[in-house]
């Protein structure tokens, strides 16, 4: 599985929020697709300040980019698209549960209006020890649930890590099963380097 951030494409930037050129992402996606790999994309959308036209334009730009993810035969690479991943840092994490779900569904509708056909929708959430998971789950055309849990290289604590993994699996796996979703987990150490 390869994962990519789409943040920046909606504003016409050449690189994503992590500094990776979108052209390089496209090439890597198509390479990975040819090898049968799983492709995961997060869209950490910038604040649109309630401007419906801007939201539509942002979504249109994402749709255009997703449409370019096709091989020489016109076969589009299928992507798990995590809209608005919950990390506790992005502006939309401050929305109420209902506002978040409404925005998530609006983005799905806008992508559908833009004829996006190569995505399955994912819900992605970052776990914080002691935090209840899945409170903002949109329950609307979601196929994949992903939970991310990373420790920092300066604070690696194995007992906390082991306990947290147990809590994630105890909370998220049955939830995914009840909702007929595939379950994935991203885990490791943040900012190695």
Show which residues each predicted segment covers.
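Short, acidic/polar
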Residues: 1, 21-28, 128-137
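Glycoside hydrolase catalytic-domain groove-lining segments
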Residues: 130-192
């Amino acid at each position: 599985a390869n994962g990519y951030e789409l943040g920046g494409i909606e504003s016409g930037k050449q690189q994503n929020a992590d500094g990776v050129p979108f052209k390089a992402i496209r090439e890597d996606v198509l390479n990975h697709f040819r090898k049968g790999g799983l492709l995961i994309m997060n869209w950490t959308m910038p604040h649109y300040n309630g401007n419906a036209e801007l939201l539509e334009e942002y979504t249109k730009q994402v749709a255009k980019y997703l449409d370019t993810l096709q091989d020489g035969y016109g076969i589009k690479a299928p992507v798990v698209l995590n809209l608005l991943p919950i990390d506790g840092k992005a502006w939309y994490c401050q929305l109420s549960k209902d506002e978040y779900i409404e925005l998530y569904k609006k983005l799905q509708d806008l992508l559908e209006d833009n004829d996006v056909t190569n995505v399955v929708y994912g819900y992605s959430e970052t776990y914080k020890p002691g935090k209840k998971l899945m409170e903002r789950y949109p329950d609307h055309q979601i196929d994949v649930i992903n939970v991310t849990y990373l420790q920092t290289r300066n604070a690696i604590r194995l007992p906390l890590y082991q306990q947290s993994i147990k809590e994630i699996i105890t909370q998220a796996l049955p939830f995914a099963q009840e909702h007929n979703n595939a379950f994935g987990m991203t885990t490791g150490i943040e900012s190695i380097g």
